[in-house]
């Protein structure tokens, strides 16, 4: 049964500007080391950062919580399987809330066009 859905859209040029400004503190606050390594290794790294940020926002919206209840940006990590399909890996407070809400699965869809990155997250309940 579907528990919640969340969608978010991000302007990729914001992340291009953050990269140009070398705003490392912002990236360290928003993204795990694995996400930073993944994005930095891509030709269009701003696009990949924007997609991951949109996915984190979409997850928070799907939970109906926002960034509260002790959640941090590092509690939600966007990963890809061997075929490139995105998914979420949850840690800390996000993992605990996921279990407390009897959620069983996340579904993630990422897309981009022009200057925009969009993410949708669907949460399934047991």
Curated annotation (Swiss-Prot):
GO molecular function, one term: holo-[acyl-carrier-protein] synthase activity
Class in the EC hierarchy, top level: transferase
Binding site for Mg(2+): 8, 57
Catalytic activity: apo-[ACP] + CoA = holo-[ACP] + adenosine 3',5'-bisphosphate + H(+)
Entry EC number(s): 2.7.8.7
A matching Pfam family: ACPS
Entry cofactors: Mg(2+)
One GO CC annotation: cytoplasm
Keywords: Cytoplasm, Fatty acid biosynthesis, Fatty acid metabolism, Lipid biosynthesis, Lipid metabolism, Magnesium, Metal-binding, Transferase
Principal localisation: cytoplasm
Gene3D superfamilies with a match to the protein in the record: 4'-phosphopantetheinyl transferase domain (3.90.470.20)
Residues spanning the signal sequence: none
Gene Ontology terms: biological process: fatty acid biosynthetic process
Localisation per UniProt entry: Cytoplasm
Family: Belongs to the P-Pant transferase superfamily. AcpS family.
Function as written in the Swiss-Prot or TrEMBL entry: Transfers the 4'-phosphopantetheine moiety from coenzyme A to a Ser of acyl-carrier-protein.
Full protein name: Holo-[acyl-carrier-protein] synthase
């Amino acid at each position: 049964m579907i528990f919640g859905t969340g969608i978010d859209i991000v302007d990729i040029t914001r992340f291009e500007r953050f990269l140009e400004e070398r705003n490392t503190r912002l990236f360290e606050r928003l993204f795990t080391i694995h996400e930073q390594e993944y994005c930095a290794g891509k030709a269009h790294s701003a696009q990949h950062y924007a997609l991951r940020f949109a996915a984190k926002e979409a997850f928070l919206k799907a939970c109906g919580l926002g960034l509260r209840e002790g959640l941090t940006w590092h509690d939600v990590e966007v990963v890809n399987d061997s075929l490139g399909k995105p998914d979420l890996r949850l840690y800390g407070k996000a993992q605990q809330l996921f279990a407390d809400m009897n959620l069983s699965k996340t579904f993630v869809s990422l897309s981009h066009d022009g200057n925009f990155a969009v993410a949708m997250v669907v949460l399934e309940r047991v």
